[in-house]
Amino acid sequence: MANTDAQNDGLREKLVAINRVAKVVKGGRQFGFTALAVVGDGDGQVGFGYGKAREVPAAIQKAMEKARANMKRVHLDGGTLQYAVTANHGSSKVYMQPASAGTGIIAGGAMRAVFEVVGVQDVLAKAIGSRNPINVVRATIKGLTDVDSPDAVAARRGKKVEDIVG
C-alpha cells in the first residue's frame, strides 16, 4: 500500500494511494490516474501532494513534486507527540496521542505513512468517521501542525518552559 523511495536530498517519500478514474465522453471512457503521496525529512517536516495524470508514473511524479513544495513544520517530543490532539477534515476525524518509547506506530493506513515520514516512532492514533485517504492525510497533518511547542505554550502563559513541561 505505501511505497518508500530514498531520494538524494534525504527526504522520505511514501506513496499512500493510487486510484484509477474515468471521464465519460461521447466516444466512451477516458481513463486517468490519481496518486496521493507524503514526503518528510524524518525530523519534523512533512508535506503531502495529490497528482493526476493519464499514466501512473506521471501521476506519482506530480504528487511527489507537490508534496515537496507543500512542506510544513511539526513540533515533536523526541519520537512522539507533545500531547494528545484531535483534528478534522471533511467528515474524517483523527485522534492522536503520545506513547511511551518502544510502543511503535499504532495507526492504520494513511496515518501510518504520515507518521513514518515525519519521524514519529511512538504514537497511538485512530481515524474516526470517513477513512478517505486524502481527508485522513489532511486531518493528520492539520493535527500535527496545530501542536504547539513547549516554548510557545510557556510564552503564551507567561511561564518558564520547566513549569510547563513539569
Swiss-Prot record:
Any GO CC annotation of this UniProt entry: small ribosomal subunit
Gene3D superfamilies per UniProt: 3.30.160.20, 3.30.230.10
SUPFAM superfamilies listed in its UniProt record: dsRNA-binding domain-like, Ribosomal protein S5 domain 2-like
Pfam families given in the database record: Ribosomal_S5, Ribosomal_S5_C
S5 DRBM domain boundaries: 11-74
UniProt-listed InterPro entries: Ribosomal_Su5_D2-typ_SF (IPR020568), Ribosomal_uS5 (IPR000851), Ribosomal_uS5_bac-type (IPR005712), Ribosomal_uS5_C (IPR005324), Ribosomal_uS5_N (IPR013810), Ribosomal_uS5_N_CS (IPR018192), Ribsml_uS5_D2-typ_fold_subgr (IPR014721)
Coiled coil spans: none
One annotated GO molecular function: structural constituent of ribosome
Sequence intervals crossing the membrane: none
Keywords: Ribonucleoprotein, Ribosomal protein, RNA-binding, rRNA-binding
HAMAP family noted in UniProt: Ribosomal_uS5_B (MF_01307_B)
Homology family: Belongs to the universal ribosomal protein uS5 family.
Subunit structure as annotated in this protein's UniProt entry: Part of the 30S ribosomal subunit. Contacts proteins S4 and S8.
Name of this chain's protein: Small ribosomal subunit protein uS5
Source organism (scientific name): Alkalilimnicola ehrlichii (strain ATCC BAA-1101 / DSM 17681 / MLHE-1)
